[in-house]
Each structure stands twice: as C-alpha cells, then as structure tokens.
Curated annotation (Swiss-Prot):
This is Ribonuclease 3. Its EC number is 3.1.26.3. SUPFAM superfamilies: dsRNA-binding domain-like, RNase III domain-like. The keyword Nucleus does not apply. Signal peptide: none annotated. GO terms for biological process: mRNA processing; regulation of gene expression; rRNA processing; tRNA processing. SMART domains: DSRM, RIBOc.
C-alpha cells in the first residue's frame, strides 16, 4: 500500500494508528482478502450510532425520541458516510479485489460507507471509546451544527408518500430492475414511478430498502422538494 497515501489519510482522519495492521484491515474489502473489514464495520456501526445518539440527546434536550431517531438516521445513513469518505479521499486507499477494482468499487457508496464504519471500529480498538468519540464529533462538527428536528428528517419514502397523499395523487410504485453482485455483496437498482415525473426515477443500494430510499430521494429532488 502507498505509504504517502496512507499517511495523508491518517492526517485527514485526525488519527495516527499505533497498530498499522488495524488500519490495513479496515481498508480491506472482502473481495481482496479473507482478513477483511466486516467485523470492524459491525463494531464501528454500533459505536457511531451511540456517539451520534449521545450528541443529539445533549444538543436537543426538548426534542422527542421520534425526531432524535430521524436526525440520527440522517447522520449515520450510507450517503452521509460516503460523503465523509470522499472528504477523506478514502477511495484511493481501499484494498479491493480485481473484480471490484474493474467495476469501480472505489467509487461505490456502499463500500465507502462501510469502510468509514470499519475505520471507526479500528480506531476504537487502537485507542479507546473517548478518543473515537472525540474524533467522530470532529468529523461531524458541521453536520451536527446544521441539523435540526422536523419533517426534513423523515426518510425520503415517507416524505414522498406524504407529499403525494397531500395532493390526492397515487402512491409511488417501486420495481427492482437489476440485482448485481454475489449474495454477500449485492447492489439493487430500483425504478420508482410517480405522478408528476414522466420517466421512472432510479435508485441504487445494498438492499432493496436502501435502493427504494435512494429512488425516493431522487424523486424529491426532481419534484424540487429537496
């Protein structure tokens, strides 16, 4: 692995690893090695959820559980994590198998998002919970400052449905048009058909649910509600 790129990545993360093998594992997709990052991803997902929930709890003392859950979902969802990954220029450091490299896996949102979670797990194991909490809060500083409770935090499918119901229009239909990849690493493509948009709107994700949410989000953008 390119030492210069790894050093630049650690600088952007705001953390230098003591155990380089943890960093290497966090950057390794299952297509590249049997010692991949999925266990670290599992750990990082739980840590991220706790840190963001704790931050929202103290930042919004009068907000109810529903709004806090929606804000947390916005902050920890895949496209937010993929945005962070692109800010870190993480794609250049990923260890991918030949098939994923050929298909552009270093750009795929799901792989980028999963790797951010794996890095969180790796930093925790390399240090402690207080350290990773401080690092996550630094990464999310602007996003936490900008987020607020309300309808904007409802998931895209809910907002699209409420918009259409409010105008007495038919509910959207979601159709799976493609499933790509092996069972452990699939990518779904969904077409969403709604009144007011002539052509189906496309969404992609690592599950049918995520692809439907992505399609609904694109529909909201086309309806100029985002």
């Amino acid at each position: 692995m390119n030492t210069l790129l790894v050093n630049q990545l650690q600088k952007k993360l705001g953390y230098t690893f003591k155990q380089n093998e943890l960093l290497l594992q966090a950057l390794t997709h299952r297509s590249a090695s049997s010692k991949h990052n999925e266990r670290l991803e599992f750990l990082g997902d739980s840590i991220l959820s706790y840190v963001i929930a704790n931050a929202l709890y103290h930042r919004f003392p009068r907000v109810d559980e529903g709004d806090m859950s929606r804000m947390r979902a916005t902050l920890v969802r895949g496209n937010t994590l993929a945005e962070l990954a692109r800010e870190f220029e993480l794609g250049e450091c990923l260890r991918l198998g030949p098939g994923e490299l050929k298909s552009g896996g270093f750009r795929r949102e799901s792989i980028l998002a999963d790797t951010v979670e794996a890095l969180i797990g790796a930093i925790f194991l390399d240090s402690d919970i207080q350290n990773i909490e401080n690092i996550i809060l630094k990464w999310y500083e602007n996003r936490l400052a900008e987020i607020s409770p309300g309808d904007k935090q409802k998931d895209p499918k809910t907002r699209l449905q409420e918009y259409l119901q409010g105008r007495h229009l038919p509910l959207p239909s979601y159709v799976v048009v493609q499933v790509r990849g092996e069972a452990h690493d699939q990518e779904f493509t969904i077409h969403c058909q709604i009144s007011g948009i002539d052509q189906p709107v496309k969404g992609m994700g690592t599950s049918r649910r995520k692809a439907e949410q992505a399609a609904a989000e694109q529909a909201l953008i086309q309806l100029e509600l985002e």
